[in-house]
Amino acid sequence: MINEVYQLIAPKLIDTAYKEIDLSKNEVILRPVKMSICKADQRYYQGLSNRAVLMKKLPMALIHECVAEVIYDPSGVFSVGEMLIPIPNTPTETDPVIAENYLRSSHFCSSGYDGFMRDYIQMPHDRLVKVPEGFDMRVASFSELVSVSVQSISRFEKFANSNRRKIGIWGDGNVGFITALMLHYLYPNAELYIFGTVEDKLNFFTFAKETFHVDAVPEGVSIDHAFECVGGPGSRPAINQMIDLIEPEGSISLMGVSENFVDINTRMVLEKGLNLFGSSRSGRKDFLRTMQIFAEHPEVGHYLENLIGDEFKVRDIPDIHKAFNADYMRNFGKTVIDWDK
């Protein structure tokens, strides 16, 4: 079976490659239905990542956020027509201590390995999770991003002390919104404080206790723990403001990606006995927990609909360029692709 794969071969240059699907494998064949563009995909497309690193990864198909329809399952575990979320992380080994998404040997779709921008996806059964019945497929398309927030919260539960009454989230973008929303449902008794820079975006956090512009935080505000969802050049002031406002022995979850080293106030980290930990990507456990949250709290999907920005029907390569170029101009929300191949 021949599969048409849409690969980025150079920044802003996409071409088709033809690869064979081995039907003798006991794996599921799916057809992508909806996709969502991630900032990492956008950096690759625009050529904004480190050029030497990018050239080692290309050519590759982009997109690691997707919902797909089952076309064929030789084992019969999944039914034809069933809607599933493919897990982009594929471990090649297991470790009793290190999670699958932190193993250096794991393969990740659209990061050196083909993403989901292809006619068909072939995946092992354990790399697929079911979408709850009746859930909005547009929101399901960016379930991977939600699972990244869930992964960070799971690590928070592992490292943070039991003082969890006041939690601060820095960042008023997509990751900040999703992380705050997940905390709202997983810790309904916690007070959530959002720190951002754009009032219009802060207004979306209707479930939070309070929102603050980072340049106008009142005296006396303090938090037990913090999540950094800023990244880029904003990481430095965000992390240092967290260090200033956090209570002793609090934990800080670092989620934002920065291309440059970030200077932080280590003196106060030591003086307060703070715990800083990183979080990246996600694994099967995080996807399952995400789907459980979707199933138990259907209103989460309605909140996440606020993130849906442009929607593009993609039939050919020019449509792909149109979707990526429009997404590049957005500063909030997710671009959803209707894969109509």
Regions found by a protein language model. Give the residues of each.
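NAD(P)H dinucleotide-binding glycine-rich loop of Rossmann-like/cofactor-binding domains
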Residues: T90-K166
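C-terminal hydrophobic helical "lid"/dimerization subdomain
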Residues: N3, R284-K341
